[in-house]
Amino acid sequence: MQASIESTGNLERRLTFTLPQERLETHVGGRLRELARTTRIKGFRPGKVPTKVIEQRFGQQVRAEAMEGLLRETFDSAVREHSLRLAGNPRIDQGETDFDFVATFEVVPDFGDIDVTKLSVVRATAEVTDADIDQMIENLRLQRRTWNPVERGAQVGDLVALETWSQAGDERLPAEGVETGSSVLGSGVMFDQIEKGLEGLTKGEEKTLTVDFPAEWRVPQLAGKTVQVHVKAVEVSEPVLPAVDKEFIKSFGVKSGDAEQFRADIRTNLERELKGALMNRLRREVGEQLIAAYAHVEMPPRLVENEARSMLAQQVEQVRRSGRDPGQVPADAHQGFMDAAAKRVLVGLLVGEVARRNELRLESKRVSETLRLIASTYEEPEQVIEMYRNDPQLMNGLQSRVMEEQVIDWIAERAQHTEQSLSFQDAIRV
């Protein structure tokens, strides 16, 4: 195989290579003969379709597929021959002839000695208590609460139905009429100054509040201004929580309505949530230590930029889902994510290097356990497991996640570590 490599930057390489034309023609010919034996075409007996007819009908597709497969195979072979470790996907361009190609890509930087025993890691621990289960049951009661209108003044926990309008200088919002809505006091849904101003209001009572909106407030006409907000309490209602009886318990999928089974199910769910939260804490802790120890290592620029653009895309999607216009996000906004992206790339490459150097292998048992854990959150867990097993993309994502967790655990076990005991609530507050 003809292949040459050159450095075009600290971490960028250019590989020029030529596809073996004979192998391509052999593969194409073999595939066409196979199609001639198996393809049914009107006017010809099975297995008797002339190769020329097959080539006219399928030749272009077969050649394109063969070229793509051979291109990847030849590139991978050249990469192995030159002992290159790629960081990200290559860009492959056509060369001077149909069989010449030029691949441009970035390589993993040299991290030198990776001694994880020098890292200092704080490993959080926590457990689910009966008090945590009691709190979750109370939260479930709040989810199923009903509302009873009252004549007294509004207090924290009450639902207040509102009519509002604002005066910002000479501008009235809305220009005519009022805006209607409702809010549970203490929920933090409304701006804090407005929410506190509603406390004590009775049904039908009106009030004018002076509110200082921050510069980044979501309504441009109010952002950074001191505004007169006129509010009217249309109705004040207090919450009525359901009793924890059999019907209540059955509504959460416990068919027997048994209180002990209900608590056992809640414990299982909370322990699953806690396990994920503790791993996220450990992932962040190990990541921060790796960043501090290897921040001096240059990262592949294109890989970092791609990560920054991916982070921006996630933010744009969040903006869209919130009902705001994603078009307001500047085209170069990814620049603001470059530092965070560089850290993500650094940790990702280091985790990969630790796995490679220490010959860590994906544990199939851990993959199965994680899959069962994910599936257990759905009503039909077996269907979820089957869906993952039949979807290579989903399964690859799961395996990558499990492999990362294995490496994080491996690093934490060998680093200098101290344990930090947390309550359940503190532990899940990541």
From Swiss-Prot:
Q: Which reaction does it catalyse?
A: [protein]-peptidylproline (omega=180) = [protein]-peptidylproline (omega=0)
Q: Which UniProt keywords apply?
A: Cell cycle, Cell division, Chaperone, Cytoplasm, Isomerase, Rotamase
Q: Which domain of life is it from?
A: Bacteria
The EC designation for this entry is 5.2.1.8
Cited PANTHER family: TRIGGER FACTOR CHAPERONE AND PEPTIDYL-PROLYL CIS/TRANS ISOMERASE, TRIGGER FACTOR-LIKE PROTEIN TIG, CHLOROPLASTIC
- What does this chain do? Involved in protein export. Acts as a chaperone by maintaining the newly synthesized protein in an open conformation. Functions as a peptidyl-prolyl cis-trans isomerase.
* HAMAP family reported for this sequence: Trigger_factor_Tig (MF_00303)
Name of this protein: Trigger factor
Q: Which organism is it from?
A: Xanthomonas euvesicatoria pv. vesicatoria (strain 85-10) (Xanthomonas campestris pv. vesicatoria)
> Lineage in the entry?
Bacteria, Pseudomonadati, Pseudomonadota, Gammaproteobacteria, Lysobacterales
